[in-house]
Amino acid sequence: MTPASPLHSPSDTVPEHSEQPMPESADATEAATEPAKPLVVIKIGGSTLGEHDTSLKDVAALHKQGIQPVIVHGGGKIITEWMDRQGIRAKFVRGLRVTDAASLDIVVAVLTGLVNKQLVNSLNNLGVSAVGISGVDGGILRAEIQDPELGLVGRVTQVNVAPIQGIISAGLVPVIAPVAVAKNAQMLNVNADVAAGEIAAAMSASRLFMLTDVEGVLDTSKRLIPRLTERQARSLMNSGIAGGGMVPKLEACLKALGSVGETHILDGRRPGALLDAYEGNARGTRIG
Protein backbone atom coordinates (compact mmCIF):
# COMPACT_ATOMS: atom_id res chain seq x y z
CA MET A 1 0.00 0.00 0.00
CA THR A 2 1.08 3.61 -0.59
CA PRO A 3 2.51 5.18 2.58
CA ALA A 4 0.26 7.77 4.16
CA SER A 5 1.08 11.43 3.55
CA PRO A 6 1.16 13.64 6.66
CA LEU A 7 -1.99 15.56 5.70
CA HIS A 8 -4.99 13.75 4.29
CA SER A 9 -8.41 15.08 3.40
CA PRO A 10 -11.25 12.54 3.18
CA SER A 11 -11.71 13.40 -0.52
CA ASP A 12 -8.01 13.11 -1.34
CA THR A 13 -6.62 10.66 -3.81
CA VAL A 14 -3.08 9.45 -3.28
CA PRO A 15 -0.79 11.54 -5.54
CA GLU A 16 2.05 10.06 -7.52
CA HIS A 17 5.45 11.28 -6.47
CA SER A 18 9.02 10.84 -7.58
CA GLU A 19 11.60 9.05 -5.47
CA GLN A 20 14.09 11.37 -3.76
CA PRO A 21 17.75 10.25 -3.83
CA MET A 22 19.13 9.15 -0.46
CA PRO A 23 22.75 9.07 0.64
CA GLU A 24 24.30 5.62 0.67
CA SER A 25 24.90 4.23 4.15
CA ALA A 26 24.72 0.91 5.91
CA ASP A 27 22.01 2.22 8.24
CA ALA A 28 19.93 3.53 5.33
CA THR A 29 20.27 0.24 3.46
CA GLU A 30 19.22 -1.71 6.55
CA ALA A 31 16.21 0.57 7.12
CA ALA A 32 15.18 0.30 3.48
CA THR A 33 15.24 -3.50 3.54
CA GLU A 34 13.42 -3.82 6.86
CA PRO A 35 9.77 -4.67 6.12
CA ALA A 36 7.18 -2.24 7.47
CA LYS A 37 4.94 -3.57 10.21
CA PRO A 38 1.34 -4.21 9.14
CA LEU A 39 -0.74 -1.36 10.54
CA VAL A 40 -4.22 -1.98 11.91
CA VAL A 41 -6.69 0.55 13.28
CA ILE A 42 -8.81 -0.79 16.12
CA LYS A 43 -11.87 1.05 17.34
CA ILE A 44 -12.83 0.07 20.88
CA GLY A 45 -16.43 0.98 21.57
CA GLY A 46 -17.60 2.76 24.66
CA SER A 47 -20.22 0.05 25.15
CA THR A 48 -17.49 -2.58 25.66
CA LEU A 49 -15.11 -0.56 27.83
CA GLY A 50 -16.35 -2.17 31.04
CA GLU A 51 -15.32 -5.56 29.64
CA HIS A 52 -12.34 -4.50 27.54
CA ASP A 53 -9.62 -6.64 29.19
CA THR A 54 -9.81 -9.38 26.55
CA SER A 55 -9.72 -6.89 23.67
CA LEU A 56 -6.63 -5.21 25.11
CA LYS A 57 -4.98 -8.59 25.63
CA ASP A 58 -5.60 -9.24 21.94
CA VAL A 59 -4.06 -5.86 21.11
CA ALA A 60 -1.00 -6.77 23.18
CA ALA A 61 -0.73 -10.15 21.46
CA LEU A 62 -0.93 -8.55 18.00
CA HIS A 63 1.72 -6.03 18.98
CA LYS A 64 4.06 -8.81 20.15
CA GLN A 65 3.58 -10.51 16.76
CA GLY A 66 5.00 -7.45 15.02
CA ILE A 67 1.70 -5.80 14.09
CA GLN A 68 1.34 -2.06 14.70
CA PRO A 69 -1.99 -1.17 16.32
CA VAL A 70 -3.51 2.30 16.33
CA ILE A 71 -6.40 2.49 18.79
CA VAL A 72 -9.35 4.85 18.54
CA HIS A 73 -11.81 4.66 21.40
CA GLY A 74 -15.31 5.74 22.23
CA GLY A 75 -16.80 6.25 25.65
CA GLY A 76 -20.50 6.77 25.07
CA LYS A 77 -21.72 4.72 28.02
CA ILE A 78 -19.42 6.52 30.47
CA ILE A 79 -20.23 9.93 28.94
CA THR A 80 -23.94 9.25 29.46
CA GLU A 81 -23.32 8.25 33.10
CA TRP A 82 -21.45 11.50 33.76
CA MET A 83 -24.12 13.54 31.97
CA ASP A 84 -26.76 11.89 34.17
CA ARG A 85 -24.80 12.97 37.24
CA GLN A 86 -24.98 16.56 35.98
CA GLY A 87 -28.68 16.30 35.17
CA ILE A 88 -28.08 16.48 31.41
CA ARG A 89 -30.21 14.15 29.30
CA ALA A 90 -28.43 12.40 26.43
CA LYS A 91 -30.03 12.81 23.00
CA PHE A 92 -29.24 10.92 19.80
CA VAL A 93 -30.09 11.56 16.14
CA ARG A 94 -29.41 8.81 13.57
CA GLY A 95 -27.16 7.04 16.07
CA LEU A 96 -25.06 10.17 16.75
CA ARG A 97 -24.90 11.99 20.07
CA VAL A 98 -26.31 15.53 20.12
CA THR A 99 -23.66 17.73 21.75
CA ASP A 100 -24.33 21.19 23.19
CA ALA A 101 -21.74 23.33 25.01
CA ALA A 102 -22.43 21.76 28.42
CA SER A 103 -22.31 18.25 26.97
CA LEU A 104 -19.06 19.00 25.13
CA ASP A 105 -17.26 19.80 28.38
CA ILE A 106 -18.20 16.37 29.69
CA VAL A 107 -17.37 14.65 26.39
CA VAL A 108 -13.88 16.16 26.28
CA ALA A 109 -13.18 15.49 29.96
CA VAL A 110 -14.37 11.88 29.86
CA LEU A 111 -12.86 10.91 26.49
CA THR A 112 -9.48 12.62 26.69
CA GLY A 113 -9.10 12.18 30.44
CA LEU A 114 -10.79 9.28 32.16
CA VAL A 115 -11.33 6.77 29.34
CA ASN A 116 -8.13 7.52 27.43
CA LYS A 117 -5.90 7.17 30.47
CA GLN A 118 -7.66 4.02 31.67
CA LEU A 119 -6.91 2.38 28.32
CA VAL A 120 -3.31 3.60 28.27
CA ASN A 121 -2.76 2.35 31.82
CA SER A 122 -4.26 -1.05 30.99
CA LEU A 123 -2.07 -1.43 27.89
CA ASN A 124 1.04 -0.39 29.79
CA ASN A 125 0.25 -3.05 32.40
CA LEU A 126 0.06 -5.61 29.57
CA GLY A 127 3.56 -4.72 28.44
CA VAL A 128 2.53 -2.41 25.60
CA SER A 129 4.04 1.08 25.74
CA ALA A 130 1.04 3.26 24.88
CA VAL A 131 0.57 7.02 24.60
CA GLY A 132 -2.82 8.70 24.98
CA ILE A 133 -3.70 11.60 22.70
CA SER A 134 -6.77 13.16 21.11
CA GLY A 135 -7.60 14.42 17.65
CA VAL A 136 -6.87 17.94 18.92
CA ASP A 137 -3.21 17.12 19.64
CA GLY A 138 -1.02 18.16 16.73
CA GLY A 139 -4.18 18.95 14.75
CA ILE A 140 -4.68 15.24 14.00
CA LEU A 141 -8.40 15.68 13.32
CA ARG A 142 -9.67 18.85 11.64
CA ALA A 143 -13.42 19.12 11.37
CA GLU A 144 -16.41 21.33 10.63
CA ILE A 145 -19.92 21.33 12.06
CA GLN A 146 -21.62 18.25 10.62
CA ASP A 147 -25.26 19.18 11.12
CA PRO A 148 -26.77 22.01 13.21
CA GLU A 149 -29.28 19.49 14.53
CA LEU A 150 -26.38 17.61 16.18
CA GLY A 151 -24.80 20.68 17.75
CA LEU A 152 -21.04 20.60 18.34
CA VAL A 153 -20.47 17.40 16.38
CA GLY A 154 -17.78 17.44 13.72
CA ARG A 155 -17.44 16.10 10.22
CA VAL A 156 -13.77 15.30 9.65
CA THR A 157 -12.27 17.41 6.86
CA GLN A 158 -8.59 16.57 7.27
CA VAL A 159 -6.39 14.04 9.05
CA ASN A 160 -2.82 14.95 9.98
CA VAL A 161 -1.10 11.59 10.39
CA ALA A 162 2.35 13.04 11.21
CA PRO A 163 1.87 13.02 15.03
CA ILE A 164 0.58 9.43 14.86
CA GLN A 165 3.52 8.38 12.70
CA GLY A 166 5.89 10.06 15.16
CA ILE A 167 4.47 8.06 18.05
CA ILE A 168 4.75 4.84 16.05
CA SER A 169 8.34 5.66 15.03
CA ALA A 170 9.18 5.97 18.72
CA GLY A 171 8.02 2.37 19.23
CA LEU A 172 4.79 3.33 20.98
CA VAL A 173 1.11 2.56 20.46
CA PRO A 174 -1.16 5.59 19.95
CA VAL A 175 -4.50 5.61 21.78
CA ILE A 176 -6.68 8.33 20.28
CA ALA A 177 -9.74 10.05 21.76
CA PRO A 178 -12.13 11.28 19.02
CA VAL A 179 -12.19 15.01 19.70
CA ALA A 180 -11.42 17.32 16.75
CA VAL A 181 -10.76 21.01 16.24
CA ALA A 182 -12.45 23.42 13.82
CA LYS A 183 -10.90 26.38 11.97
CA ASN A 184 -12.14 28.76 14.66
CA ALA A 185 -10.37 26.66 17.34
CA GLN A 186 -13.71 25.27 18.57
CA MET A 187 -13.36 21.69 19.78
CA LEU A 188 -15.90 19.27 18.32
CA ASN A 189 -17.15 15.84 19.32
CA VAL A 190 -16.54 13.28 16.57
CA ASN A 191 -18.19 9.88 16.51
CA ALA A 192 -15.48 7.32 17.32
CA ASP A 193 -16.49 5.04 14.44
CA VAL A 194 -16.15 7.94 12.01
CA ALA A 195 -12.80 8.96 13.49
CA ALA A 196 -11.46 5.41 13.25
CA GLY A 197 -12.53 5.11 9.63
CA GLU A 198 -10.95 8.43 8.66
CA ILE A 199 -7.68 7.62 10.43
CA ALA A 200 -7.55 4.13 8.91
CA ALA A 201 -8.07 5.56 5.42
CA ALA A 202 -5.53 8.35 5.90
CA MET A 203 -2.90 5.86 7.09
CA SER A 204 -3.73 3.23 4.44
CA ALA A 205 -4.17 0.65 7.20
CA SER A 206 -4.16 -3.02 6.30
CA ARG A 207 -7.21 -3.66 8.49
CA LEU A 208 -9.91 -1.68 10.28
CA PHE A 209 -11.58 -3.45 13.19
CA MET A 210 -14.69 -2.03 14.88
CA LEU A 211 -15.23 -3.66 18.28
CA THR A 212 -18.76 -3.33 19.63
CA ASP A 213 -21.25 -5.04 21.97
CA VAL A 214 -23.12 -7.12 19.38
CA GLU A 215 -22.05 -10.06 17.20
CA GLY A 216 -21.83 -7.90 14.10
CA VAL A 217 -24.46 -6.83 11.57
CA LEU A 218 -27.70 -8.77 12.03
CA ASP A 219 -30.51 -9.56 9.58
CA THR A 220 -34.25 -9.24 10.25
CA SER A 221 -34.17 -12.57 12.13
CA LYS A 222 -31.32 -11.29 14.34
CA ARG A 223 -28.88 -13.69 12.70
CA LEU A 224 -25.30 -12.66 12.04
CA ILE A 225 -24.43 -11.64 8.49
CA PRO A 226 -20.82 -12.83 7.94
CA ARG A 227 -20.07 -10.59 4.95
CA LEU A 228 -21.68 -7.63 3.21
CA THR A 229 -21.03 -6.00 -0.12
CA GLU A 230 -21.22 -2.22 -0.30
CA ARG A 231 -24.60 -2.46 -1.99
CA GLN A 232 -25.97 -4.84 0.65
CA ALA A 233 -24.70 -2.64 3.48
CA ARG A 234 -26.38 0.44 2.02
CA SER A 235 -29.60 -1.49 1.50
CA LEU A 236 -29.64 -2.54 5.17
CA MET A 237 -29.18 1.07 6.26
CA ASN A 238 -31.77 2.44 3.83
CA SER A 239 -34.34 -0.14 4.94
CA GLY A 240 -33.70 0.50 8.63
CA ILE A 241 -32.66 -3.11 9.30
CA ALA A 242 -29.28 -1.73 10.33
CA GLY A 243 -30.03 1.27 12.51
CA GLY A 244 -28.89 3.24 15.55
CA GLY A 245 -25.21 2.94 16.37
CA MET A 246 -24.62 0.42 13.58
CA VAL A 247 -25.15 3.12 10.93
CA PRO A 248 -21.98 5.14 11.64
CA LYS A 249 -20.01 1.89 11.86
CA LEU A 250 -21.16 0.76 8.44
CA GLU A 251 -20.70 4.20 6.92
CA ALA A 252 -17.17 4.44 8.32
CA CYS A 253 -16.27 1.00 6.98
CA LEU A 254 -17.68 1.80 3.55
CA LYS A 255 -15.84 5.10 3.36
CA ALA A 256 -12.55 3.43 4.30
CA LEU A 257 -12.86 0.61 1.76
CA GLY A 258 -10.92 2.34 -1.01
CA SER A 259 -7.85 2.84 1.18
CA VAL A 260 -7.99 0.01 3.74
CA GLY A 261 -7.33 -3.65 3.02
CA GLU A 262 -10.21 -5.09 5.08
CA THR A 263 -12.92 -3.73 7.37
CA HIS A 264 -14.66 -5.76 10.08
CA ILE A 265 -17.33 -5.22 12.74
CA LEU A 266 -16.69 -7.58 15.67
CA ASP A 267 -18.15 -8.48 19.06
CA GLY A 268 -15.61 -6.96 21.45
CA ARG A 269 -17.12 -8.90 24.36
CA ARG A 270 -16.04 -12.25 22.93
CA PRO A 271 -12.63 -13.48 24.12
CA GLY A 272 -10.14 -13.66 21.25
CA ALA A 273 -12.41 -11.91 18.73
CA LEU A 274 -9.70 -9.55 17.53
CA LEU A 275 -6.99 -12.21 17.24
CA ASP A 276 -9.35 -14.58 15.43
CA ALA A 277 -10.31 -11.86 12.95
CA TYR A 278 -6.71 -10.96 12.19
CA GLU A 279 -5.89 -14.63 11.61
CA GLY A 280 -8.79 -14.95 9.15
CA ASN A 281 -11.27 -16.61 11.49
CA ALA A 282 -13.56 -13.65 12.06
CA ARG A 283 -16.96 -14.32 13.61
CA GLY A 284 -18.31 -10.84 13.01
CA THR A 285 -19.22 -9.07 9.78
CA ARG A 286 -16.70 -8.22 7.07
CA ILE A 287 -17.62 -5.25 4.90
CA GLY A 288 -16.56 -5.29 1.24
Predicted feature residues:
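C-terminal catalytic "cap/lid" subdomain
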Residues: T2-G288
